[in-house]
């Protein structure tokens, strides 16, 4: 059986001159009962109970343009960050079946939090949520709205997305 999201993924040629900028914001959360373990590619083994910190958000902006191959730069809080960039690269490679158009784009990814880094508030899920929403937004500019892979990457990001 074919995966529903893969069957809806944009698989065509990105048009010449395709470019733009998208941005999304996703709130962080604090888990009261945390999920234990993961299955598959970052899918939670069991549910968790958490509450949303609506004033503590991760914001991601992606500038994109047509390219011969995937190329990207990642900036966190205004500074290029190769360590975070390596995690983004792994995600893009692992999930290129969901986002095949990325192999035809050059991306500049900018991410920041509305709360201090290393303050004890987890930002990995909210950052991944904002990032995935940006990718889905780029895809929607190619084919129209999608409901894509909301549980991929961190497990809880599907509960966090808020349009800026």
Please name every model-derived segment.
Residues 1-119, 133-143:
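ATP-binding N-lobe of GHMP and related small-molecule kinases
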Residues 87, 127, 158-162:
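Short acidic-hydrophobic sequence patches enriched in Asp/Glu that either
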Residues 107-110, 144, 155-164:
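Beta-strand segments within the central parallel beta-sheet cores of soluble alpha/beta enzyme folds
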Residues 121-123:
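Active-site nucleophile and cofactor-binding loops and adjacent substrate-binding regions
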Residues 126-134:
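Short amphipathic alpha-helical face segments that pack within enzyme cores
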Residues 146, 150:
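Short Gly/Ser/Thr- and charged-rich N-terminal loops/segments
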């Amino acid at each position: 059986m074919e995966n529903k999201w893969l069957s809806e993924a944009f698989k065509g040629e990105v048009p010449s001159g395709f470019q733009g900028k998208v941005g999304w914001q996703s709130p962080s959360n604090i888990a009261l009962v945390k999920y234990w373990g993961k299955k598959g590619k970052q899918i939670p083994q069991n549910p968790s109970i958490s509450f949303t910190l609506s004033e503590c958000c991760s914001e991601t902006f992606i500038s994109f343009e047509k390219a011969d191959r995937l190329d990207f730069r990642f900036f966190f809080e205004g500074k290029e960050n190769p360590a975070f960039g390596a995690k983004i690269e792994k995600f893009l490679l692992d999930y290129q079946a969901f986002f095949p158009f990325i192999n035809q784009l050059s991306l500049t990814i900018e991410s920041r939090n509305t709360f201090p880094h290393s303050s004890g508030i987890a930002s990995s899920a909210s950052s991944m949520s904002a990032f995935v929403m940006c990718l889905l937004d780029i895809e929607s500019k190619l084919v129209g709205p999608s409901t894509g892979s909301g549980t991929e990457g961190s497990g809880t990001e599907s509960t966090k997305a808020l349009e800026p």
